[in-house]
Amino acid sequence: PQGRPVMFLHGGPGAGCSPAHRRLFDPERYNILLFDQRGCGRSTPSADIEHNTTWDLVADIERLRTEVLHADRMAVFGGSWGSTLALAYAETHPDRVRALIVRGIFLLRQAELRWFYQEGASWLFPDLWEDYLAPIPEAERDDLMAAYRRRLTGDDPQAQLQAAHAWTQWESHTISLLPNPAHHRAHAAAQAALAFARIENHSFVNRGF
């Protein structure tokens, strides 16, 4: 607790933190806070998308800084979606950021989302793309994120889980060029897959609010 305060912001949104994330920091030097963002990881209620926007999360970070870390300033570390959130926090509260570390930078641009979820990455992983398309009828494939949203937020639990697993497996298998079983297992459980897919899709369809 006497170390330099640092807050770790995970990816997704919806991925949650893992014990491995602690290994990024020397516990002899840093007071480390791993923050499971709203609706995912150990946060409750799970898979909840109400009051779950970028700016709700920025407010959560600021509250954790004051009420948990008790720090005037802190380092903020984020990768992928975590980099988006870290940048949003740093722009909103620049005087509270001692250091900003971002990797795998993702800026939530329309071109990035379209490349990964509509057309682009599909050319690199054609076999996995077929699995991603499977829950969506051809008539709805002109806007895949919107089609997934209808299923992830619909009233049919079976359709929700089918969509959640397809969305999650697409991302976990394509997040690196070489297979990584740890990524594949991270959201294999039904509730973890639903939380990840619903929250991520919710954010992306709404362009991060």
What is each residue range found by the language model?
Residues A164-F209:
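Alpha/beta-hydrolase fold catalytic core
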Residues Q2-P45:
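Conserved HGGG/HGGXW glycine-rich cap/lid loop of the alpha/beta-hydrolase fold
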Residues P137-L178:
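An accessory alpha-helical subdomain
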Residues V76-G78, R103:
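Short beta-strand immediately N-terminal to the catalytic nucleophile in serine-hydrolase-like folds
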